[in-house]
Amino acid sequence: MAAKATGVVGKVRQVIGAVVDVQFGDHLPAILNALETTNVGNRLVLEVAQHLGENTVRCIAMDSTEGLVRGQEVRDTGAPITVPVGPGMLGRIINVIGEPVDEEGPVDAIEMRSIHQPAPTYVEQSTEAQILITGIKVLDLLAPYAKGGKIGLFGGAGVGKTVLIQELINNIAKAHGGYSVFAGVGERTREGNDLYHEFIESGVNKKGGGEGSKAALVYGQMNEPPGARARVGLTGLTVAEYFRDQGQDVLFFVDNIFRFTQAGSEVSALLGRIPSAVGYQPTLATDMGALQERITTTTKGSITSVQAIYVPADDLTDPAPATSFAHLDATTTLNRAIAEKGIYPAVDPLDSTSRMLDPMVVGEEHYAVARQVQSILQRYKSLQDIIAILGMDELSEEDKQTVARARKIERFLSQPFFVAEVFTGAPGKLVDLADTIKGFKGLCNGDYDHLPEAAFYMVGGIEEAVEKAQRLAAEAA
């Protein structure tokens, strides 16, 4: 391997948290090269970020630097960080530098790939408008996902991004014939652990990997240094790109893209860069573009990516979520006000968008029903001030009817999740697109005006709502 041949040795000159300065004799490693040393008996990888002159480089550490001392020897590998790729990754968990962390022995790799790859060229890219059915009513109706597209789940703290991404994994990855890659970027270790065991229990993966496993996991969780969190998304993407290049349709889940930006901003200040708006790194758009442009569908295969994006203080104009918007085909916005009403998934039907909601793609009926639902909800929203001040009695008969239908639609957009079954006790529901359209069409046309609001809350298809209404009537009698 070329990396072994270069083995030029330098010495640690300075350690400032996650940033380490290394000086070489008459050699200067290239930017993004991986340098290796040992720290407390463990392999420590440093990535070159800056040239400081006089053969000194400033590096970002991929693991804790506690115990690292000045004068310690560091070897230049002569190549960027490389990670194992191939079918041997399925069912396994690796970290940012490709080491297995699931205590199941070494990873069986076909080849080693650099985590820094160029984005596919214009001619290699492929665009095909096809819908990805999720079985979640609000998504399929109002902001349908594209096969081979990029989907962002935006939401503040605790409104249900991770639960929604886990439900999508449950509904799509389990039914999906191809492979999935999950990148845990700076999120809770507990959730990563739960997901790993959930995959084994549901048969998506076999314990210890190997034949029959369909998902690869790449983790760099909250407790990791910023270097690992800033690069683990690229590691996951490299694994996904390999499967795509083999002609697979890959699902790539990232939780959470904001932590990638946050890690970049943590190391940016230590590297001496002048911060930009709100203290973020000046290279925010470049970093995001370098990651997002690689997540794309080529003529060889497709990558459909679902990314959870944390919204700091529920402010969608914050530079981190705002930079992500430009790269996405569909945006699903989770709203705290909807979560407070107890409506889950707390998707904002008026704030979520998709370029697939086009009559040429979804068909005239679907498009007309979706727009009608949105117009009823928008009318209800504009009437809320009047209702708050004057009460319902001051509304016209037509407006009263609109409000009644809107409240039913709002409740019918909720749905019990499979992954939340343990918390709610309600069995999860998958709703077919045709049933979703039929149900909302009936609601908009007033076919269900005689049913109570409560009948539409946390049900699957419209038949269930009718059954629930009959049950409620029988209980009340």
UniProtKB/Swiss-Prot annotation:
Subcellular location, record wording: Cell inner membrane
Any one GO MF annotation of this record: proton-transporting ATP synthase activity, rotational mechanism
Catalytically driven reaction(s): ATP + H2O + 4 H(+)(in) = ADP + phosphate + 5 H(+)(out)
Enzyme Commission (EC) number: 7.1.2.2
TM region(s), chain numbering: none
Assembly mode: F-type ATPases have 2 components, CF(1) - the catalytic core - and CF(0) - the membrane proton channel. CF(1) has five subunits: alpha(3), beta(3), gamma(1), delta(1), epsilon(1). CF(0) has three main subunits: a(1), b(2) and c(9-12). The alpha and beta chains form an alternating ring which encloses part of the gamma chain. CF(1) is attached to CF(0) by a central stalk formed by the gamma and epsilon chains, while a peripheral stalk is formed by the delta and b chains.
HAMAP family (alphabetical): ATP_synth_beta_bact
Role played: Produces ATP from ADP in the presence of a proton gradient across the membrane. The catalytic sites are hosted primarily by the beta subunits.
Identification of the protein by name: ATP synthase subunit beta
Organism expressing this protein natively: Mesorhizobium japonicum (strain LMG 29417 / CECT 9101 / MAFF 303099)
